[in-house]
């Protein structure tokens, strides 16, 4: 890699809901677009429109009435490799870069199956002819972006949540916990509440409207039961929301009922621990000597940790679970919605000490895709 130090690596973070991509060394991603691929429902329907066999991202979103939308990444893990033309779109259309000229840093969900990591490596080197690549765990990058190398990351995005303890830059795989509860479930839960109360009726195509409502109006109550009582007595929690057709609806207790599901999954019929207990359980799976460092560095990451009030509530809940003498600190970086882990990737790929960690094409040719498990150690 020594000869290519003036070439900026590409950093691509593929989330369940959004792709964030750009150049290492930049302080924000150049491209942020939905992780969706759409294919025409009927060939020939779009005559005269220069019909493509597939549309990606915002273009797919805008044509959603006449194409079938697919999310190739489910619960943070690639489930449909045919639809990963998202990478082609990212490099050539969004970044206007030739991947054969740039090293590429990809991100992956914690506990990503080994076969998936190998497939990502193979596609990058054999299909895109990249000179070098690396796969890093998303939560590790979020921690780097917060200026830490030790801590526990609660990463909750659109499709999945994880708690990932990290010690001196390395994820501790035995203590990573996954929770199949995230933003999409909260949006669906809010749709259900609104429909039950006949506030409005939605189909999947209009899920985007409810997602927007959730992002603009939902918040986490410090004390859920007390907030319910307050909502019954006073209209202070009520807010108006204007639908695209101009109709105005009022939502009250739904604003904090929606994200309460993160702490109480039983509200939507899920038998699992909430995000606070999952964080605590992850810490308890770690060596007793490092727990203090983890309790003092709980870092929130991902769009589903953006609700006002979530950091205070996490702090309160974990304080109740932890030993009484333990100092608890919950950190909520302001850029965590889209770009914190992308920034972590940008920092990592720019470090001079990282340059010998890339998997080069030569190493791949010698060892095959399994080299990813030997070289990508920061990926847990």
From Swiss-Prot:
Q: Where mainly found?
A: cytoplasm
**Cross-referenced PROSITE patterns, in alphabetical order?**
ACTINS_1 (PS00406), ACTINS_2 (PS00432), ACTINS_ACT_LIKE (PS01132)
Q: Which GO terms describe its cellular component?
A: cytoplasm; cytoskeleton
The coiled-coil segments of this chain are none
Matching InterPro entries: Actin, Actin/actin-like_CS, Actin_CS, ATPase_NBD
Q: Identify the enzyme class.
A: hydrolase
Q: Which locations, inside or outside the cell, does it occupy?
A: Cytoplasm, Cytoskeleton
Q: Which GO terms describe its molecular function?
A: ATP binding; hydrolase activity
- What EC number is given for this enzyme? 3.6.4.-
Q: Which reaction does it catalyse?
A: ATP + H2O = ADP + phosphate + H(+)
Q: Where is the signal peptide?
A: none
Keywords, comma-separated and alphabetical? ATP-binding, Cytoplasm, Cytoskeleton, Hydrolase, Nucleotide-binding
What the record says about family reads: Belongs to the actin family.
What is the protein's known function? Actins are highly conserved proteins that are involved in various types of cell motility and are ubiquitously expressed in all eukaryotic cells.
Protein name (record): Actin-1
Q: Provide the species name.
A: Daucus carota (Wild carrot)
